[in-house]
Swiss-Prot record:
NCBIfam families recorded: L31, PRK01678.1
Protein name: Large ribosomal subunit protein bL31B
GO terms, biological process: translation
GO molecular function annotation: structural constituent of ribosome
Keyword Ribonucleoprotein attributed: yes
Organism: Xanthomonas oryzae pv. oryzae (strain KACC10331 / KXO85)
Family: Belongs to the bacterial ribosomal protein bL31 family. Type B subfamily.
Keywords: Ribonucleoprotein, Ribosomal protein
Amino acid sequence: MKDNVHPNYKDVVFHDVTSDFKILTRSTMTSKETVKWEDGQEYPLIKVEISSSSHPFYTGKHKVIDTGGRIDKFQKRYAR
């Protein structure tokens, strides 16, 4: 493998600001912000607006929003 070709892969903390969930993982992303983790070390902090901790699909709080009766119209058209 060639030297200096691959990105720097290191430990980072992802922070879901919606649910205040933090996870320590590895990534090539960088950040000027740092956070002190449970092990006492400081890691780069990557803030995200949505993750599996707050996304409706993963939390089970998914809602179907019917705009203008489109679902009813579809069901009437294709009802058997």
